[in-house]
Amino acid sequence: MPAIAIIGAQWGDEGKGKATDLLGTSVDYVVKFNGGNNAGHTVVITDASGHTEKYALHLLPSGILTPGCTPVIGNGVVVDLAVLFEELDALEQRGVDVSRLRISANAHVIADYNRTLDKVTERFLGSRRIGTTGRGIGPTYADKMNRIGIRVQDIFDEKILTQKVEGVLDLKNQVLTKIYNRRAATVEATVEELLAFADRLRPMVCDTGLLLNQALDRGETVLLEAGQATLLDVDHGTYPFVTSSSATAGGACTGSGIPPRRLEQVIGIVKAYTTRVGEGPFPTELHDDAGEHLRKVGAEFGTTTGRPRRCGWYDAVIARYAARVNGVTDFVLTKLDVLTGLEQVPVCVAYDVGGVRHDEMPVNQTDFHHAVPIYEYLPGWWEDISGARTLADLPANAQAYVKAVEEMSGARISAVGVGPSRDATVAIHDLI
């Protein structure tokens, strides 16, 4: 069986968790391959009696909620161990079996000095800040690239861990004390903080690349879920307003240890409108009642930070870009229900940059900052669509919206989200 990647095709918060969880019933492994606890996803589960449970996850793969599925944290993830066990304990208290979790021995670990540096750097930058979550993600990835990072496997050898922490703090404390006027971090406190997790962590840790490739050899299905999204990818996003990891289909391979030839399907997740958290360009952003409507009805507040998300109309230009960068085979269009009640729904089909039409995303970020959306206006609908389960169940104008977005976005739409619950989905094509 193949490996399948689920990728955010906008600026994040597209509903990847719900899509992953829906597919998780048909797969054997769900893998988080990038990022850390800087992004969150909410999964809503309704049991046979109609009782609804909402789960907010930040670090764990959403497959943790699917019985019989093995959730995996891959080598491309940076792990805050305190957050990891907070999430595991919270799920265990609600009756979720968390013993299935597997974690790569090569994943990097967020230390307290990484969190401190993240926060003080953002404050130091002031108006030039990136808009990070302050959770130490960027500094931990920087340590990884600089070859001074702490990996999960290091926590099981106190001597090696101490040597590594001593080496990294020689550098970090120079920055903390002499540039930011902060207190120096100590080797003893840092080592103690990390060693405290060793016994609980040990049974979960393995060579996850080997684990996943052996699963594929046995004919099992592996689902790779991205944190963040294409437009936040460190290489292909709106740099420098990006995350510090690879959030594209290419990153799915490097962050999991699965070779590219085994990745047969790439599912791009797009909202029926667009949102963004933090700084950076956003051509279709709304600053009026329409934007407030999307934010209120769509409950657009960050799972991780609680920050209000910036809201705007659907941008087919960035969807086409994401389809090209990732090789998207299928789109899942989420939150179509949020558009219910609007008289007309604009869709951005191109940009005007200095009087010149751009049908593709400008490679020059200055041009992208100055891009003015060119809209096509589609008729809205008033009917409640939350009970729709087939395309024919949708009102004619909602069907027309889905078809128009599909034609503009560069890949077929195979499913449409029409509500927050797990089963509130219109199936158009089989995803597996």
Curated annotation (Swiss-Prot):
PROSITE patterns documented for this protein: ADENYLOSUCCIN_SYN_1, ADENYLOSUCCIN_SYN_2
UniProt cofactor(s): Mg(2+)
GO MF annotation list: adenylosuccinate synthase activity; GTP binding; magnesium ion binding
Taxon lineage: Bacteria, Bacillati, Actinomycetota, Actinomycetes, Propionibacteriales
Positions annotated to bind Mg(2+): 13, 40
TM region positions: none
Reactions this protein catalyses: IMP + L-aspartate + GTP = N(6)-(1,2-dicarboxyethyl)-AMP + GDP + phosphate + 2 H(+)
Cofactor note: Binds 1 Mg(2+) ion per subunit.
The encoding gene: purA
Family: Belongs to the adenylosuccinate synthetase family.
Gene3D superfamilies found in the cross-reference section: Adenylosuccinate Synthetase, subunit A, domain 1 (3.40.440.10), Adenylosuccinate Synthetase, subunit A, domain 2 (1.10.300.10), Adenylosuccinate Synthetase, subunit A, domain 3 (3.90.170.10)
Localization terms from the record: Cytoplasm
Known EC number: 6.3.4.4
Subunit structure: Homodimer.
Pathway: Purine metabolism; AMP biosynthesis via de novo pathway; AMP from IMP: step 1/2
Protein name as it appears in the record: Adenylosuccinate synthetase
GO biological process: 'de novo' AMP biosynthetic process; IMP metabolic process
PANTHER family the record matches: ADENYLOSUCCINATE SYNTHETASE
